[in-house]
């Protein structure tokens, strides 16, 4: 068992990036507002996005290159499109996840209630971990975080389920009001994660191969599938927590990070019992810390690679981009810290409406001449991919048409 865990890496980094805002904030809100009514959206998003995430490690294993190299081979304009989309979203995404993490740190540690101070502390901690240890430390840290998160979340769901007196209601709901539709799109945008994480996944796969040269293709794909299944299970768990504890409670979530965190944990402890405080607080904080550090690592890696491919060597530097991202995040944080909900909504909706681009680019690349034939997807995965592209494109067009 220990040997199996040691082989895991990029899949758990994927889980770490995926299970933050999409699970803790969006899945919990979905459960609180709709009960289990949006379970269909969670399952469909995970199903139809699966091939495009899978193509990340598959392409890297086939070619020894990242998907960004593949984008450049498809067309320089594909890579430039990625760069523009990434620059638009990465600061907002990093700020959104840091706000939630800082709010939860206030509840868990209680040293100071100043959310700006906690944001600075968290970003500084993440910077130190990444600049000192880079991939190796992040890889090892994530194994601990994911195990802790999974155990504490499953325990919290079990306690909530045994203490709940209401019957399980699984009627599925399709929102009709404009606000509810916007939430649905935001929910699906980051469920289980934005599709650009497939690029991060391909880079992490290459890093894992450097660290462990003997790791096989089968082990890498197994690692990815473990991470993916973990995100699905935990997504359902957080919907269950929101439904069992908060549904029909009469509470309205605040858009302020610290207040949201307080409401989240207090509602749990009031309903489940004060003894559950540590379980919920640890599960919530480790979820968001894992997302924060993973995002802070991945975006600079992709910027370095992208600018290298474009021939702009002077700014193709990991340390340069991680500092830019940290400073940009804290700057946005100071000006928008009272609008956590708005930031999360903007970040998640942007992720959804850009998903068709990543889906089409990844599908085209994995089936192109740039991928050896023996590594190209099976007919079944290709059928699922086409259905996924149709699903994501139709939903995006429909949403944009009703704005």
Task: Tell me the role of every PLM-derived stretch.
Residues 11, 83, 108-131, 147-158, ...:
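Transmembrane alpha-helical segments of multi-pass small-molecule transport proteins
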Residues 62, 79-110, 288-306, 340-342, ...:
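Hydrophobic transmembrane alpha-helices that form the core helical bundles
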Residues 42-55, 219-247:
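Selective recognition of specific alpha-helical transmembrane segments in multi-pass small-molecule
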Residues 29-54, 69-73, 77-80, 182:
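Extracellular loop-to-transmembrane helix junctions
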Residues 147-174, 184-203, 359-371, 395-403:
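Hydrophobic alpha-helical segments and their helix-loop junctions in multi-pass secondary transporters
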Residues 130-162, 175-178, 347-355, 380-388:
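Membrane-interface loop-to-helix entry segments
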Residues 27-29, 54-77, 105, 109, ...:
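Flexible loop linkers connecting adjacent transmembrane helices
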């Amino acid at each position: 068992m220990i040997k199996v865990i040691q082989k895991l890496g990029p899949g758990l980094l994927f889980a770490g990036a995926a299970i933050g805002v999409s699970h803790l904030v969006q899945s919990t809100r979905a459960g609180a507002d709709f009960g289990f009514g949006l379970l269909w959206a969670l399952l469909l998003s995970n199903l139809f996005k699966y091939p495009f995430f899978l193509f990340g490690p598959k392409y890297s294993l086939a070619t020894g290159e990242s998907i960004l190299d593949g984008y450049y081979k498809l067309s320089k304009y594909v890579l430039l499109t990625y760069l523009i989309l990434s620059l638009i979203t990465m600061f907002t995404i990093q700020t959104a996840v840091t706000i939630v993490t800082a709010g939860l740190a206030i509840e868990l540690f209680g040293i100071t209630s100043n959310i700006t101070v906690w944001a600075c502390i968290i970003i500084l901690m993440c910077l130190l971990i990444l600049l000192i240890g880079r991939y190796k430390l992040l890889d090892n840290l994530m194994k601990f975080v994911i195990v802790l998160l999974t155990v504490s979340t499953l325990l919290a769901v079990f306690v909530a389920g045994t203490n709940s007196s209401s019957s399980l209601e699984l009627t599925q709901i399709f929102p009709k009001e404009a606000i509810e539709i916007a939430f649905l799109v935001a929910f699906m945008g980051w469920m289980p994660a934005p599709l650009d994480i497939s690029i991060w996944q391909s880079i992490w796969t290459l890093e894992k191969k450097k660290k462990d040269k003997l790791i096989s293709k089968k082990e890498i794909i197994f690692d990815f599938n473990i991470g993916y299944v973990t995100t699905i299970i935990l997504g359902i768990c957080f919907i269950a927590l929101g439904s069992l504890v908060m549904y029909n409670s009469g509470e309205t979530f605040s858009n302020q990070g610290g207040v949201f965190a307080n409401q989240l944990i207090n509602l749990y402890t009031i309903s489940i019992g004060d003894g559950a405080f540590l379980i919920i607080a640890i599960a919530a904080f480790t979820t968001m810390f894992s997302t924060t550090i993973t995002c802070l690592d991945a975006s600079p890696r992709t910027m370095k690679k992208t600018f290298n491919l474009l021939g702009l060597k002077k700014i193709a530097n990991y340390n340069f981009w991680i500092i830019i991202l940290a400073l940009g995040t804290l700057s946005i944080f100071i000006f928008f810290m009272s609008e956590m909900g708005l930031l999360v909504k903007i970040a998640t909706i942007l992720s959804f409406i850009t998903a068709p681009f990543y889906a089409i680019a990844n599908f085209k690349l994995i089936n192109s001449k740039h991928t050896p034939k023996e590594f190209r997807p099976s007919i079944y995965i290709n059928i699922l991919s086409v259905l996924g592209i149709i699903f994501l494109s139709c939903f995006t067009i429909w949403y944009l048409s009703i704005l």
